[in-house]
Amino acid sequence: MAAHSSCNFALTNPIISQIDSFSKKKLSVPLYFFSTRKALTNPWLGVVDSSLSLTSPVSALQTNRPRRIHKSAISSLPTANPDLVVSDAKKPKWSWRAIKSFAMGELEARKLKYPNTGTEALLMGILIEGTSFTSKFLRANKIMLYKVREETVKLLGKADMYFFSPEHPPLTEDAQRALDSALDQNLKAGGIGEVMPAHILLGIWSEVESPGHKILATLGFTDEKSKELESFASESGFLDE
């Protein structure tokens, strides 16, 4: 009697009947086909992001697969005087420290929200790189990064806080001449060895009216110290490390 009544209850209960009828049906379409880009609505949660909808296992793997990032190596720094380089065979090589110093200078110009990479930024780049003999030479003479930053803001002023620098702030004319001077120093020495941060610093110092030269002079850098650094850089086997 009890078994008979429970059977009647199952047949008369609409919820159980619906569940039972649904379980007997077979889906003719794969479950992941029902993935949709539309937002789902829920009376309690409001709009539910479509990312919660079911997706194909294959597409999920493709989505989670890390993207390949192609990196290009920088082989040289910009020059405004291509006549300095006659052919690829004679093209001087920039050391990795010089290239990193240049990249750090660009980044510092962006941090300060300046529209260009000037000699002051190249100077800060040498100090930020930090491992070269030139950067150690500057610090030994009490020319520190924070001091150069302070003098830069005093000399050039603060940039507009709402201004966004380009990804690669273009070089100012004096910064370009400083890099060309660094390149020229290497060529005058016979093009032997690499162009190093020491050559960049000497190029900055050669631009007397540039912000970088003025900041160096304010912090105690002199022609005597420039000649001292030049004597080190001209030695055979000097690697600026």
Curated annotation (Swiss-Prot):
PROSITE patterns: CLP_R. GO terms for molecular function: protein histidine kinase binding. Residues 91-237 form the Clp R domain. Residues 1-75 form a transit peptide. Residues 94-159 are annotated as: Repeat 1. It holds the Pfam family Clp_N. It comes from the Eukaryota. InterPro entries: Clp_N_dom_sf (IPR036628), Clp_R_dom (IPR004176), CLPT1/2 (IPR044217). Its main location: plastid. GO terms for cellular component: chloroplast; chloroplast envelope; chloroplast stroma; cytosol; plastid stroma. Keywords: Chloroplast, Plastid, Repeat, Transit peptide. It is found in: Plastid, Chloroplast. Disruption phenotype: No visible phenotype. Clpt1 and clpt2 double mutants show delayed development, reduced plant growth, and virescent, serrated leaves. Clpt1 and clpt2 double mutants are seedling lethal under autotrophic conditions. Residues 171-237 are annotated as: Repeat 2. The MYFF motif is functionally important for stabilization of the overall ClpPR complex. Monomer and homodimer. The dimers monomerize before association to the P-ring. Component of the chloroplastic Clp protease core complex which consist of at least 16 proteins: CLPP4 (3 copies), CLPP5 (3 copies), CLPR4 (2 copies), ClpP1 (1 copy), CLPP6 (1 copy), CLPR2 (1 copy), CLPT1 (1 copy), CLPT2 (1 copy) and 3 copies of CLPP3 and/or CLPR1 and/or CLPR3. Interacts with AHK2. Interacts with CPN21. No interactions with CLPS1. Belongs to the ClpA/ClpB family. Accessory protein regulating the assembly of the plastidial Clp protease system. CLPT1 first binds to the heptameric P-ring containing the CLP3-6 subunits followed by CLPT2, and only then does the P-ring combine with the R-ring composed of the clpP1 and CLPR1-4 subunits. Once the core complex is fully assembled, it then associates to the CLPC chaperone partner to form the functional protease. CLPT2 and CLPT1 are partially redundant. This is ATP-dependent Clp protease ATP-binding subunit CLPT2, chloroplastic. The lineage of its organism: Eukaryota, Viridiplantae, Streptophyta, Embryophyta, Tracheophyta. The gene is CLPT2.
